[in-house]
C-alpha cells in the first residue's frame, strides 16, 4: 500500500539523521539500504517508535510510495549514484522524482538531469550541508535540476531545513541542472578558505604573540561576539580549550597534516576553467597539500633558515585586534571571489541564480554559517546586479576600516617568517582589483614578441595589433610559440 511521502536510500549516519528529521516534521519515510540488514537494525534501534517504514527491495520501496514518487539517494558520489538510478528507472513512472543528496560533481548532475528528462523522470541534485548534526536538526539544502520537481519537494525540504531570522528556511530552489551541486561545491571551497584563514590567525597568535591556549580560546570567544560571529570561530575556541585525559591541551598533539576530500580542489579547478581569480580558495587547498608533506618539512626545518626573531612593535592587545581585522578583511575577499565564480558559472551555463538567496541558504545549518552571510544577503537585496561584493557600500567601508590592520599583520608576519598564504593572497587580490592599470601590458608585449599573439591599444580597444619587435626590443624574432 502506498503510504510513504518519500524514500531515502543509504543508511549511513547522514541518511539516518535526515530520515529522523523528516519524521519529526510529520512525513512518512521509507528507508532502504543495499545491505538490507541495516534497514532492520535502523527500524529496531534509532527509528524505533517512529512512523518510518522499511523496504526489503527497491521494488518493495517503490510500491510503498505515494505519487509522484520521491526518492532521495544518499550514497557515495560517482558510480554508486548511476547504479541506483539505472535500477530505479524501470520501476518509476513519468513525473516521478529522484534526488541526489550526495557530494556529486556538478557536471554529473547535469548529465543525469538530461538523461532522465528524456525518460520522463525529474532529477534533482541537492547540496546538503551541516554534517550529521545538521542532517538531524536542520541542514542547509541547495536543490537544483529539473524545476518541475520543486513544487513536489519544496514542502518537505523547507520543513526540514535550518531556520534563521523569523523562521526563514535555509533552502530554496537554486537553478537548473547542476546549479545546486555547483553552489554546494563553492560552499565547500569557501569552507576551506575560512578554515585556513582561522589557522593563520592561530599561527600568528601562537608564534608572534606567544599566547597560551586559554588566551587564544578567550580571544576567539571574544571575536565570536563581533562581525566574525560564526560556527567555525565558535568551535575553534572550544578546540583550543579542549584537554586530553592527561589534563593537557589536545591540539598541540595532533599531527599537522590536513586531509581533504576534494571539493575544495574542485572549486579551484572550476575557477581556473572559467578564468576567475578565486585565489584564496586555491591557496587554502595548496596549504593543505603543503601540510601533508610532513616528513619533508621536518627535514627542511633542520636545514632552511628563517629570519631572526623580530620584536613586536606596540602592544600585544593592539596587534591581536589587527589580526582580527585582517581575518575579517580576508574573509570578505574570499566570499567576494566565491560569488564571482558563481556569477561566471551562471553566465557559462545560462543559470539564473539568486545570490542573496544563496547567502541566506548558507546563513544557517551549514559549516560556514555566520552572521556575516546576512550582510551578503542585504548587499544583493540592495543591488541584485551587484558585480562584486567589494563594490557594495557596506563591504567597501568594512575593508577600508580593516585595511591598515591588514597590512600591518602581513608585514609583521612576513618579517617573522610566518606562512600566511590566504592573508597575503587576499590582500594581493584586493590591491590588484583596485588598480586601474596592472603590468599585464608587459605580458601582452612579451607574448606578441615571442609568439605574435597580438595586443590591443588602450586607445583602440577591439583592434588587435602585431608588432615586429626585432631591432627595438632585442634580436629575438617572433615565433608561433604559445604561452
Swiss-Prot record:
Coarse class of the protein's main subcellular location: cytoplasm
Pfam families: 6PGD, NAD_binding_2
Catalytic reaction(s) noted: 6-phospho-D-gluconate + NADP(+) = D-ribulose 5-phosphate + CO2 + NADPH
InterPro entries, alphabetized: 6-PGluconate_DH-like_C_sf, 6PGD_dom2, 6PGDH_C, 6PGDH_Gnd/GntZ, 6PGDH_NADP-bd, 6PGdom_BS, NAD(P)-bd_dom_sf, Pgluconate_DH
Domain of life: Eukaryota
Active site: 184, 191
Localisation: Cytoplasm
A GO BP annotation: pentose-phosphate shunt
Keywords carried by this UniProt record: Acetylation, Cytoplasm, Gluconate utilization, NADP, Oxidoreductase, Pentose shunt, Phosphoprotein
GO MF annotations, alphabetized: carbohydrate binding; carboxylic acid binding; NADP binding; phosphogluconate dehydrogenase (decarboxylating) activity
Binding site for substrate: 103, 129-131, 187-188, 192, 261, 288, 447, 453
Modified residues (Phosphoserine): 57, 129
Enzyme class: oxidoreductase
Residues binding NADP(+): 10-15, 33-35, 75-77, 103, 478-481
Modification type N6-acetyllysine: residues: 38, 59
One cellular-component annotation, GO: cytosol
Pathway of action: Carbohydrate degradation; pentose phosphate pathway; D-ribulose 5-phosphate from D-glucose 6-phosphate (oxidative stage): step 3/3
EC numbers on record: 1.1.1.44
Oligomeric form and interacting partners: Homodimer.
Protein's job: Catalyzes the oxidative decarboxylation of 6-phosphogluconate to ribulose 5-phosphate and CO(2), with concomitant reduction of NADP to NADPH.
Family assignment from sequence similarity: Belongs to the 6-phosphogluconate dehydrogenase family.
PANTHER family: 6-PHOSPHOGLUCONATE DEHYDROGENASE (PTHR11811)
Record protein name field: 6-phosphogluconate dehydrogenase, decarboxylating
Gene it is expressed from: Pgd
Amino acid at each position: 500500500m502506498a503510504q510513504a511521502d518519500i524514500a531515502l536510500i543509504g543508511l549511513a549516519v547522514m541518511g539516518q539523521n535526515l530520515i529522523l528529521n523528516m519524521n519529526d516534521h510529520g512525513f512518512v519515510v521509507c528507508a532502504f539500504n543495499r545491505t538490507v540488514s541495516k534497514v532492520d537494525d535502523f527500524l529496531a534501534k534509532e527509528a524505533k517508535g517512529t512512523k518510518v517504514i522499511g523496504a526489503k527491495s527497491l521494488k518493495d520501496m517503490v510500491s510503498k510510495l505515494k505519487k509522484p514518487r520521491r526518492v532521495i539517494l544518499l550514497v557515495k558520489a560517482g558510480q554508486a549514484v548511476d547504479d541506483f538510478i539505472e535500477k530505479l528507472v524501470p520501476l518509476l513512472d513519468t513525473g516521478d522524482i529522484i534526488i541526489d543528496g550526495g557530494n556529486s560533481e556538478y557536471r554529473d548532475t547535469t548529465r543525469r538531469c538530461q538523461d532522465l528528462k528524456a525518460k520522463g523522470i525529474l532529477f534533482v541534485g541537492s547540496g546538503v550541508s551541516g554534517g550529521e548534526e545538521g542532517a538531524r536538526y536542520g541542514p542547509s539544502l541547495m536543490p537544483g535540476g529539473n524545476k518541475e520537481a520543486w513544487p513536489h519537494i519544496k514542502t518537505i525540504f523547507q520543513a526540514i531545513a535550518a531556520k534563521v531570522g523569523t523562521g526563514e528556511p535555509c533552502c530554496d530552489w537554486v537553478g537548473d541542472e547542476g546549479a545546486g551541486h555547483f553552489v554546494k561545491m563553492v560552499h565547500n571551497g569557501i569552507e576551506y578558505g575560512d578554515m585556513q584563514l582561522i589557522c593563520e590567525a592561530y599561527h600568528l597568535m601562537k608564534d608572534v604573540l606567544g599566547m597560551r591556549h586559554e588566551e587564544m580560546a578567550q580571544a576567539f570567544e571574544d571575536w565570536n561576539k563581533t562581525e566574525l560571529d560564526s560556527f567555525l570561530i565558535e568551535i575553534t575556541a572550544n578546540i583550543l580549550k579542549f584537554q586530553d585525559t592527561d589534563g593537557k591541551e589536545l591540539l598541540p598533539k595532533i599531527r599537522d597534516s590536513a586531509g581533504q576530500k576534494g571539493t575544495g580542489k574542485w572549486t579551484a579547478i572550476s575557477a581556473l576553467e572559467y578564468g576567475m581569480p578565486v585565489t584564496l580558495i586555491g591557496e587554502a587547498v595548496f596549504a593543505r597539500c603543503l601540510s601533508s608533506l610532513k616528513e619533508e618539512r621536518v627535514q627542511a626545518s633542520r636545514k632552511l633558515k628563517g629570519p631572526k626573531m623580530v620584536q613586536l612593535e606596540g602592544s600585544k592587545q593592539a596587534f591581536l585586534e589587527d589580526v582580527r581585522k585582517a581575518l575579517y578583511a580576508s574573509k570578505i575577499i574570499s566570499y567576494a571571489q566565491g560569488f564571482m565564480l558563481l556569477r561566471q558559472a551562471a553566465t557559462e551555463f545560462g543559470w539564473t541564480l539568486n545570490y542573496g538567496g544563496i547567502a541566506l541558504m548558507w546563513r544557517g545549518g551549514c559549516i560556514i554559517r555566520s552572521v556575516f552571510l546576512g550582510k551578503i544577503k542585504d548587499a544583493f537585496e540592495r543591488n541584485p546586479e551587484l558585480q562584486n561584493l567589494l563594490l557594495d557600500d557596506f563591504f567597501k567601508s568594512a575593508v577600508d576600516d580593516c585595511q591598515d590592520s591588514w597590512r600591518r599583520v602581513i608585514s609583521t608576519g612576513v618579517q617573522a617568517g610566518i606562512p600566511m598564504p590566504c592573508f597575503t593572497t587576499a590582500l594581493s587580490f584586493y590591491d590588484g582589483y583596485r588598480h586601474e592599470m596592472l603590468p599585464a601590458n608587459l605580458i601582452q608585449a612579451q607574448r606578441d614578441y615571442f609568439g605574435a599573439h597580438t595586443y590591443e591599444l588602450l586607445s583602440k580597444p577591439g583592434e588587435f595589433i602585431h608588432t615586429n619587435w626585432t631591432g627595438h626590443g632585442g634580436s629575438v624574432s617572433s615565433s608561433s610559440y604559445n604561452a
